[in-house]
Amino acid sequence: MGLPGSKALGGGLYELRDMGRGAGYRVYYTWVGDMIIILLAAGDKGSQERDIDLARRRLADLPDAP
């Protein structure tokens, strides 16, 4: 189950978008058990590809990564 405004990006990575405010900032996160782990609070659409790559690297570094 995700959060409102969230999108599954695969491999246990999720993107939460700012719904209708400002520049559309994003937060990338994962679930470990019943905890949400914030991997990256990031910029707007212009940096999205780089931000997702960084979030995926951080996810891979988690000891209990999904």
Where is each model-derived feature located?
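A short, surface-exposed loop/turn module that caps and links secondary-structure elements
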Residues: 1-21
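Enriched for short, Lys/Arg-rich terminal
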Residues: 17-66
